[in-house]
Swiss-Prot record:
Binds 1 copper B ion per subunit. Binds 2 heme groups per subunit. This is Cytochrome c oxidase subunit 1. Cu cation binds at H249, Y253, H298, H299. Keywords: Cell membrane, Copper, Electron transport, Heme, Iron, Membrane, Metal-binding, Respiratory chain, Translocase, Transmembrane, Transmembrane helix, Transport. PROSITE patterns: COX1 (PS50855), COX1_CUB (PS00077). The lineage of its organism: Bacteria, Bacillati, Bacillota, Bacilli, Bacillales. It comes from Bacillus sp. (strain PS3). InterPro entries: Cyt_c_oxase-like_su1_dom (IPR023616), Cyt_c_oxase-like_su1_sf (IPR036927), Cyt_C_Oxase_1 (IPR000883), Cyt_c_Oxase_su1_BS (IPR023615), Cyt_c_oxidase_su1_bac (IPR014241).
Length: 616
């Protein structure tokens, strides 16, 4: 049986994506879902900025403002940035290491559907009484008091389901990169984006379990009468802060390290030279990940840990600036002496350096424990983390979208529209967040929904809101670009930019279902570039052409995740309604039954015969 033939019709395409285990199509699913949640989180941000545009505004007040604020942060971190990072990991990493798929294709699909249904469950709260309203960190002191509706319960269960999917993805990429690299691809010949994915997956493996434990504790307290965080019964709300931030700070690097990997690929490609200091970049990536687990309590300087603990975490936090600085200078030296081509991805890459450095500088300021008593819970902190997350991660996601779009879809996004998007986004970003440093320094606290006239915050907030509309305009133009490209964009060859250095650019755009007809032989770093420099148009094969084994599609990942989605509703309402417990049991039976079917039914996949490959 073969699935090489393109399927026609909306129904066939929909079924294909619902049942796919192909890493490239799963990348499309992550990209579409993450893009949707990015738009949703952006809309929530726009509502926040409209409310704060003038004093005593009543556009979005009180509890509703708290819900929108909470969902903005939660959506952007867990449901937009994370899946978009996973989209590029899925689309690119197997191609960069010369593999035909990931190690566990079924688990890859299950990971996506777990994320999707977790995010869907979380957003159902909007229509079922109210969304989470305790901030994206959902501190226990606020969450346990939020009993007016089930918003926090949607938060705890939705993030658990989504988090399980993320952990599955991390395990999958660790095994894939360790076991499935093409012959000759040693660890020190891997592209930087693959290195970033490898280290990030290890981070996820250790960072997400503490969050999962915290969410289980929170769920037990709220739904089953537990007292983990209830001081009146001997619990401690500070435990939640430690559990959350042991996850929360590594989460920054879970997002930023893949961004660094994307920029490393872009700088090398469009400077038309090898990445400067490759070995030091690898070690800096590993060191950042290691130090990332030693700094979580800098979020808690004002909690009362004492001067010794504060000093230790302050020094550890400042230390992370060293390997990050190594990366910044290596990118600059990569451009130095290069023949730079200023494409849309390169615009984002160059703009990232000053933007991210500004976020890093304010990070070192916040790392001073004594000074943090002034900065804490002010708009200075809001400005800082947006300079890091938007200036680092979102710039990288936009750069990666333009850079790998032709590889994923076979068509080039319009460069003129791309550069208009960039300039609007760049100007809007700095307009929105630069002024917020000064709002914070003049005393504006974060999370407030209004302020009085004559406090000196009117002008800054108005400028910030105007900047947000620039970002919105940039997003609209990006969507127009995608629609126009899909309708009539120019088709591209395998090496879409003409300067590709890594293996993904050596095959067709978009790649065939099997990726590589023959597993390539890797003879050095920047393997495709080496072949081109020797005048070869194709990679050197490491094996003769033969039949290719591929996994079958399966509907079970969708059903397993859907079962947990159903069960989550039952657990949420089991104290309020008689149907709660039966629905929870039904959902678990759907999930466990599907897992049983997966265990007992033999599925050996199928083969694509070499004659079919030759025809293509």
């Amino acid at each position: 049986m073969s699935t090489i033939a393109r399927k026609k019709g909306v129904g066939a395409v929909l079924w294909d994506y619902l049942t796919t285990v192909d890493h490239k199509k799963i990348a499309h699913l992550y990209l579409i879902s993450g893009g949707f949640f990015f738009l949703l989180g952006g809309l929530e941000a726009l509502f926040i900025r409209i409310q704060l545009a003038k004093p005593n505004n009543d556009f979005l007040v009180g509890g509703l403002y708290n819900e929108v604020l909470t969902m903005h942060g939660t959506t952007m971190i867990f449901l937009a940035a994370m899946p978009l990072v996973f989209a590029f990991m899925n689309a690119v990493v197997p191609l960069q290491i010369g593999a035909r798929d990931v190690a566990f294709p079924f688990l890859n699909a299950l990971g996506f559907w777990m994320f999707f249904f977790g995010g869907l469950f979380l957003n159902c709260s909007w229509f079922l009484g109210g969304a989470p309203d305790a901030g994206w960190t959902s501190y226990a002191s606020l969450s346990l008091d939020s009993k007016a509706h089930h918003g926090i319960d949607f938060y705890t269960l939705g993030l658990q389901i989504s988090g399980f999917g993320t952990i599955m993805g991390a395990i999958n990429f660790l095994v894939t990169i360790i076991n499935m690299r093409a012959p000759g691809m040693t660890f020190m010949r891997m592209p930087m984006f693959t290195w970033a994915t490898f280290v990030t997956s290890a981070l996820i493996l250790f960072a997400f379990p503490p969050l999962t434990v915290g969410l289980i504790f929170m769920m037990m307290d709220r739904l089953f009468g537990g007292n983990f965080f209830n001081p009146a019964a001997g619990g401690n709300t500070i435990i939640w802060e430690h559990l959350f931030w042991v996850f929360g700070h590594p989460e920054v690097y879970i997002l930023v390290l893949p961004a660094f990997g994307i920029f490393s690929e872009i700088f090398a490609t469009f400077s038309r030279k090898r990445l400067f200091g490759y070995s030091s970049m690898v070690f800096a990536t590993v060191l950042i990940a290691f130090l990332g687990f030693m700094v979580w309590a800098h979020h808690m300087f004002t909690v009362g840990m004492g001067p010794i603990a504060n000093a230790i975490f302050a020094v550890a936090t400042m230390t992370i600036a060293v390997p990050t600085g190594v990366k910044i200078f290596n990118w600059l030296f990569t451009m130095w002496g290069g023949s730079i081509k200023f494409t849309t991805p390169m615009h984002y890459a160059v703009a990232f350096i000053p933007s991210f450095v500004m976020g890093g500088v304010t990070g070192v300021m916040l790392a001073s424990a004594a000074a943090d008593y002034q900065y804490h819970d002010s708009y200075f902190v809001v400005a800082h983390f947006h300079y890091v997350i938007v200036g680092g991660v979102v710039f990288a996601l936009l750069a990666g979208t333009h850079y790998w779009w032709p590889k994923m879809f076979g068509r080039m996004l319009n460069e003129t529209l791309g550069k208009i998007t960039f300039w609007l986004f760049f100007i809007g970003f700095h307009l929105t967040f630069f002024i917020q440093h000064f709002l914070g320094l003049t005393g504006m606290p974060r999370r407030v929904f209004t302020y009085l006239p004559h406090q000196g915050w009117e002008t800054g907030n108005l400028i910030s809101t105007i900047g947000a509309f620039f970002i919105a305009a940039a997003t609209v133009i990006l969507l127009i670009n995608i629609v126009v490209t899909t309708a009539k964009g120019e088709k591209v060859p395998g090496d879409a930019w003409g300067d590709g250095r890594t293996l993904e650019w050596a095959i067709a755009s978009p790649p065939p279902v099997y990726n590589f007809a023959q597993t390539p032989l890797v003879r050095g770093l920047d393997a495709f570039w080496l072949e081109k420099m020797e005048g070869k148009k194709e990679l050197t094969p490491a094996e003769p052409l033969g039949d290719i084994h591929m996994p079958n599609s399966s509907f079970l990942p969708f059903v397993i995740a859907f079962g947990l989605f159903v069960a989550a509703f039952g657990f949420t309402y089991h104290n309020d309604a008689g149907w709660g417990l039966p629905v929870a049991i039904l959902g678990l039976l759907i999930t466990l039954g599907s897992m049983f079917l997966r265990s007992v039914i033999d599925d050996h996949g199928f083969h694509i015969h070499k004659e079919e490959v030759l025809e293509l």
